[in-house]
Structure formats: structure tokens, C-alpha cells
Amino acid sequence: MPLIIGIDPGSRLTGYGIIEKNGNELRFIDAGTIRTESQDMPERLKRIFAGVERIVKFHGPTQAAVEQVFMAQNPDSALKLGQARGAAIAALVNLDLEVAEYTARQIKQSVVGYGAADKEQVQMMVMRILNLTIKPQSDAADALAAAICHAHASGSMSKMAVLNALGGMARGRSRSSTRRR
């Protein structure tokens, strides 16, 4: 039963989420944020690297998923985000984890069924898929969503299994079921 860590990189808050995949079932293990406020950038990167490394050593995930950098309107923000992402990936690779990368749109499509979903929709679906009773922080929910996306992409999670896990909430309609006869 592999453990998957998802990372939602950020220069001030880096979210992490760990799930266990057992066949078609996903189980919540841990989630939270690595806070790096009020330090200069090299110190923030050091905290991200050390935080990711500590979490991986504690839980021992065998797979990792990281959200790719989006193109921000502010180039400085995009550079900082890229640096934070690099620190997290370096920590994962340093511990011999293979890193899968997904765009925000791919993650949202996998978890919510809609690539332009908002943060609230992602949080609610993460809660539903993992049977959580408390809404995770936004960054932690995004990291859990990355881990869920990777579990879906890794092969044994069929679309039908995902729909069953959701209790039919996201029932799809075939074209034939929407036609008038």
C-alpha cells in the first residue's frame, strides 16, 4: 500500500498532504503547511527543503506529486514560486523519491472533474474523497489534491472507482442519456 505525498509549493506557505492508496481506496494520513514567513529567500528555501525532508523521513512515502508553476502576472512572484518548488523537489529527489508533476488544471480536473474549479470546490471534493470531517487548509487541500491526482494517474484508480468513492456525487451523463427520444 503505497503512501503518496503531494506538495503545493509556495514561498511563504508550502502545503503537503499524504495519502495511502490501497487498490481503489484512498486514505488520509497527514496534511499541513510548512510556514516560512518573515525570513529572507535563502532562509525560506532552507526551511522548505528541511520541512519536506522531515515529513518524508517521518512518513516514508514512496511516491511524490508536485504542482507545476503557473505563469503569474508578476514575474518576481513566479520566480519565488519556482524557487520554492525547486527546494521541495530537491528534498524529495534527495531522498530518492521519483517526482510526478501536474498542472493545476490537471489536478482540478482529476479531483473535481472541472479544470477551472475554485479553491473551495477543491477543498470540498478532497474532504469527500478522503472522508474528512474537517476542511483542510487551502494549501494542504491543494497538496492532498495533487496526491489524489497522482493516485488516479498511476493506473489502478478507474473513473468508476472514483465515482463510487464519491457516492455518485459526480455522476456523469452519457450523450445518449441527455437526448430526447
UniProtKB/Swiss-Prot annotation:
GO terms for molecular function: crossover junction DNA endonuclease activity; DNA binding; magnesium ion binding. GO terms for biological process: DNA recombination; DNA repair. InterPro entries: RNaseH-like_sf, RNaseH_sf, X-over_junc_endoDNase_Mg_BS, X-over_junc_endoDNase_RuvC. Its main location: cytoplasm. It comes from the Bacteria. Mg(2+) 1 binds at residues 8, 139. Keywords: Cytoplasm, DNA damage, DNA recombination, DNA repair, DNA-binding, Endonuclease, Hydrolase, Magnesium, Metal-binding, Nuclease. Mg(2+) 2 binds at residue 67. Binds 2 Mg(2+) ion per subunit. The keyword Signal does not apply. Its EC number is 3.1.21.10. The keyword Hydrolase applies. The active site is at 8, 67, 139. It catalyses: Endonucleolytic cleavage at a junction such as a reciprocal single-stranded crossover between two homologous DNA duplexes (Holliday junction). It is found in: Cytoplasm. GO terms for cellular component: cytoplasm; Holliday junction resolvase complex. Its cofactor is Mg(2+). The RuvA-RuvB-RuvC complex processes Holliday junction (HJ) DNA during genetic recombination and DNA repair. Endonuclease that resolves HJ intermediates. Cleaves cruciform DNA by making single-stranded nicks across the HJ at symmetrical positions within the homologous arms, yielding a 5'-phosphate and a 3'-hydroxyl group; requires a central core of homology in the junction. The consensus cleavage sequence is 5'-(A/T)TT(C/G)-3'. Cleavage occurs on the 3'-side of the TT dinucleotide at the point of strand exchange. Homodimer which binds Holliday junction (HJ) DNA. The HJ becomes 2-fold symmetrical on binding to RuvC with unstacked arms; it has a different conformation from HJ DNA in complex with RuvA. In the full resolvosome a probable DNA-RuvA(4)-RuvB(12)-RuvC(2) complex forms which resolves the HJ. NCBIfam families: ruvC. Belongs to the RuvC family. This is Crossover junction endodeoxyribonuclease RuvC. It comes from Acinetobacter baylyi (strain ATCC 33305 / BD413 / ADP1).
